[in-house]
A protein has these predicted regions:
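Active-site phosphate-binding/coordination module
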Residues: 2-90
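Substrate-recognition/cap helix-loop segment adjacent to the acidic, metal-dependent catalytic center
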Residues: 24-43, 109-129
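Substrate-recognition "cap/lid" segment bordering the active-site pocket of phosphatases
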Residues: 51-71, 127-159, 220
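Short, surface-exposed ligand-recognition loops at beta-strand->loop->(often short) alpha-helix junctions
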Residues: 68-72, 105-112
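Charged, glycine-interspersed solvent-exposed loop segments at helix/strand-loop junctions
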Residues: 92-108, 132-139
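Mg2+-dependent phosphoryl-transfer enzymes with acidic/Ser/Thr/Gly-rich catalytic loops
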Residues: 138-139, 146-225
Length: 225
């Protein structure tokens, strides 16, 4: 993160409620340090957890667990992932708090068509996949970031939601927001994804990060275009 990016993030905390949203589980999220004051709300585990002042909202967690219980079970997905993720290209397979799973892979060693095959298998069972760098995720379609964001926005009485993301697991979030942005790199850019209410940065890498937080600041009314 550049110094300019960090400074803009600190200013954003004055313009509105900055809510981190991540696929990371709580333990992984707590290792992340963002500039500025600690957020009142954070959304982790791809929407399964809403943290309020750093503590999980148990009612929300229970409602998510009840919703997921009606779907195709994680145990069966884990079994399939264990079967198809061969040692030649898989470093390890991980369970994310009993909600979804992911494999740490060597992307350059993945067999031709592997990502498409696992995506097809998952889709037939109400799950979706996302390849983000070295991590290949299997996540239930009913576990979404957008549902958690809508709940947080409702509690806050927010009249406008802005969002940023770079993976297929961010699509529902970007589409649910009033406006969104994604960087000129990552899974969404590589797949040519676009939407009328979502813009793309002009640059990639660290400069994309600066452009994203600058976009947030302008959209929130804190800087001139």
């Amino acid at each position: 993160m550049t110094a300019a990016c960090a400074a803009t993030i600190e200013r954003l905390a004055v313009l509105g409620e900055l809510v981190p949203v991540t696929t990371r589980v709580n333990e992984q999220y707590r290792r992340v340090r963002l500039p500025g004051p600690a957020p009142l709300y954070a959304i982790t585990t791809n929407g399964a957890e809403i943290l309020v002042n750093g503590k999980p909202d148990r009612d929300w967690s229970r409602s998510v667990a009840d919703r997921l219980a009606a779907g195709f079970p994680l145990d069966a997905v884990w079994e399939q992932a264990s079967h198809v993720c061969h040692p030649e290209f898989t470093v390890k397979l991980r369970n994310a708090d009993g909600l979804f799973c992911y494999a740490v892979v060597r992307p350059k060693h993945l067999p031709m068509g592997f990502a498409e095959d696992v995506a097809g298998w998952a889709a037939e069972r109400g799950w979706r996949t996302s390849l983000q760098g070295r991590k290949l995720y299997w996540v239930p379609e009913t576990l979404t970031k957008s549902a958690a964001v809508r709940e947080v926005a409702r509690r806050m009485g927010a009249d406008r939601v802005l969002a940023a993301g770079d993976s297929l697991l961010d699509v529902d979030l970007l589409l649910a927001a009033d406006a969104g942005i994604h960087p000129r790199h990552g899974e969404l850019f590589d797949q040519g994804w676009s939407a009328p209410t979502v813009t793309c940065t002009e640059s990639s890498g660290e400069l994309a990060g600066e452009q994203i937080v600058g976009w947030f600041e302008r959209e929130a009314g804190g800087a001139s275009a």
